[in-house]
Regions:
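ATP-dependent adenylation/nucleotidyltransferase module used to activate substrates
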Residues: 9-145
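N-terminal amphipathic/basic-hydrophobic helices that include classical n-h-c signal peptides
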Residues: 1-9
Length: 145
């Protein structure tokens, strides 16, 4: 019987400078991916998307992470998703839920904080940035919708 191992991530030798683009939101997941790639010897290029979100603290956090990791380039790309609507994160007429606990059951429907196709849009932009920078790796950290 044959056993196959799948490597989800292949690091390069530290003496070889490969390029990585990280979609850097400022959150824990993308910061971890950026740090991981940097630690593994990649020259990291960070892309942060300013999509008109309410929480500009995310943009500040992304800048702090990029600075702390001394990324090669940190591009903040303004792509206004507010006209798309349908999300509490971009539409001021929709209230952002407060006080949810991690152990509470999640509703069967999509949360009001979901931004339609946001990650798909972001990945398309990151792929374009990665291709332009001749990156070998594209990193993203996602933990929810």
């Amino acid at each position: 019987m044959r056993t196959h191992r799948v490597k989800l991530f292949m690091a390069t030798p530290k003496d070889t400078k490969k390029r990585a683009v990280v979609l850097l939101s400022g959150g824990l997941d993308s910061a971890t991916v950026a740090a991981w790639l940097s630690n593994d010897g990649f020259e990291v290029y960070a892309l942060t998307v300013d999509y008109g979100q309410r929480h500009v603290v995310e943009l500040k956090a992304a800048a702090m992470v990029a600075d702390a990791l001394s990324v090669k380039e940190h591009l903040v790309l303004p792509i206004d998703l507010r006209p798309v609507g349908a999300s509490a994160l971009t539409d001021l007429s929709i209230e952002v839920p407060k006080g949810l606990r991690a152990d509470e059951p999640v509703a069967a429907n999509i949360p009001v904080t979901y931004v339609p196709a946001r990650n798909t849009v972001f990945l398309s932009l990151a792929l374009s940035f990665a291709e332009a920078r001749k990156a070998d790796v594209l990193g993203i950290g996602v933990n929810a919708l």
